[in-house]
Structures are given as C-alpha cells and as structure tokens.
Amino acid sequence: MWHPEDHPPLPDVVASGRKPDVLACGFCHRADGPGGPENADLAGLPKTYIIQQMSDFKRGTRRTAAPGRLPPTLMIGLSKPITDADVETAATYFSSLRPRKRIQVVESDSIPKTYIAGLVWAEVGSGEREPLGDRIIEIPDDLIRFESRDPRSTFTAYVPVGSLEKGGALVTKGGAGKTVQCATCHGPDLKGLGPLPGIAGRSPSYVFRQLYDFGHGHRTGEWSPLMAQVVNNLDQNDMLAIAAYLASLDP
C-alpha cells in the first residue's frame, strides 16, 4: 500500500473485493479514491450519490456512449454480484475522504507527443510535439507511479487555448442562457450540495464523458433528467470548456 497515512484503514471490499466477481474498489479508484482520467474520483462524493450510481449501473440506467470501454463495462458487471452491504461500506468509506488537487490545466495549441498506455494518454518523451486540436489530453506526470496505483499521482491536462475563459463563463453565468449556472445544483463553491456531487477539481476527461453521456441519453437515473436539460444546448466544444474550467478549480 502506497500511503497508509493518507486514509483510514481500508474496508475489505475496498482493499480486496470479494472473489471471484467483485474487484477491489481500491484497485481502480486507488486506496483513497482519486481514480484517474479513465474513471471516477470517489473521494468526498456524497454517500447517497455513490449508492445511487451503483444502483443505476445495476438497473441499466447508467451506461456509456462507448460500450466497449473497460471501466464502465467493469462497473456494470460488478454492480450485479456486489451486495448492498458492500456498496454501503464502500460508499461510507469514500465519502469520508477529502479530495485533493492533483490536476494542472494547461492551455496550448500543441502538446508533447503522446501514445496510449493502457487506458490513458502518456508522453512519448522524445521531445517532439503534436497539435492538440479540439481535445483534452490528460497525462500522468509520472506514468510508472500512476500504473503502480500511487494515489498521490498528479496529472497535466492540456486543453485548447481559450477553454478556461469560455468554460468559466458557461459554469458561472450559464453562457448567456445557453445552460444553467452549475452552482445552482452543485453548491456555490461547486463542491457539492446535499446528495449532489462536487465537480470542482475533477478529471476533465471524466467530466467531459459524463456531460456527453447525459446529453445523449446514456445516463437516465435519478437526477439525470435535470442534467440532460442542462447540457441540451451545449456542443462538444462547450462541454470541453466546462470540463477544463472545473478541473482548474480546487476540489
């Protein structure tokens, strides 16, 4: 275990799972819940929200626009055999943790040359650069530590120039009626409100995927209809800008 001083003792379902069909939560989401660009940051999410998402996976009301992606496929699969008691235990644990700032957002027209390392982008390290285009490219600052499940891993998220200003206007003001101010539901500091999750400081790759899934009917569980209305008038560049701005904030 990397940093046992960073978190309370791990419940069995987080540390070991339940063989043969329930993976350890901490393997993918790390011991204190930060996850990575490929999946969710669970640290500090409301307990009721985590439980609801597991229910949505199980009932088929939380799916993905890319059905072949491994992380959501695993979540849908393990939502069937995992017990309600294990979900309750994991949700209690992760909701008790404090999220950490781990993402630096950099606006740029070009980025270090990249390749796909498993489920994430990684830097080739050759000194070459490539155009960013209309993408978010989120790279572990130390790939080996990230792949070794270090929960203190940090990331650099490259976003197109102008994303932060545009995203800030959409998030804080609704973009002149294009959407709803995020603080309306997610709290004045965007760190959550009641059963609704904090969205400040979250992975921009992950947030973009969720906005896209809400907008295309792949998330239809509780509260999802409200989000579908929020993203209804947004195009992908708007979603990218929102995700970039949110990632730049302290969680």
How does the language model describe each region?
Residues 31-32, 188:
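Cys/His-rich metal-chelating microdomains
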Residues 34-38, 193:
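Acidic/histidine-rich, surface-exposed loop or edge segments in extracytoplasmic proteins
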Residues 26, 43, 76, 183, ...:
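Cys/His/Pro-rich metal-binding microdomains
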Residues 41-48, 199-205:
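Short cysteine/histidine-rich metal-coordination sites, predominantly Zn2+-binding motifs
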Residues 165-172, 180-183, 188-191, 195, ...:
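Long compositionally biased, domain-poor regions of proteins
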Residues 1-27, 31, 62-181, 216-251:
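Flexible coil segments in periplasmic/lumen-exposed cytochrome c-class electron-transfer proteins
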